[in-house]
Amino acid sequence: MLNRIRSVFAGERGLPRSQVERLGRLPPGERLAGVGAALHDLCVTTAARFVEEEHRRADSPFGGLPKTDLFHEMLVMNFWALERLFKGRRRALMDQVYDRYSTSFVWGWESGRTDLVDSMRAKFTAYDEAWDDYSGHQDGFARQALAIIFGGTPVAEAPRAAFWLISYADRTMKDFTEVGKSVKLLLRDAA
């Protein structure tokens, strides 16, 4: 099994090979929680990398946003990408991801896990309705994401911000497709 997982990650897109090997050695009953934690951490790392890159660039359209707010919205976008990848077939795994999220990132909110997940799912629905798998034109998605990220405030650099959000979402989905292959192998015999 480990050799098949290694072959999936030859390009190291997604989870690092060493992490996949470690997860593959977990007993099947512990593997679901381990994979959920790894996916959560991957989403966090990916969102944090985007925020840091954007805040380093002097001409970033996201430069005026607080890092924590931008990070949270990019994290939600990553969770949406995972939901799209699994198409509802990995509910127990996504519950592990959201449990870790709700205990790690409360942002001072007064709400509990259910309210946090419901809030994210409303954004997922908006993103799903706007994403165009058929034509590949993602202007509607970009408008929706900009409205969520900027709270409906007009964005002076909207075309550039839209470009970066579409590029980010597309790249993340492609990278997560590779992650999905290892998840399938890792959870094949897990409880």
Regions found by a protein language model. Name each.
Residues 83-86, 106, 188:
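Hydrophobic/aromatic-lined pockets within catalytic cores
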Residues 53, 57, 96, 115, ...:
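Residue-level signal for alpha-helical context at structural boundaries
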Residues 10-11, 87, 112, 151:
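Short, flexible coil/linker elements and helix-boundary hinge sites characteristic
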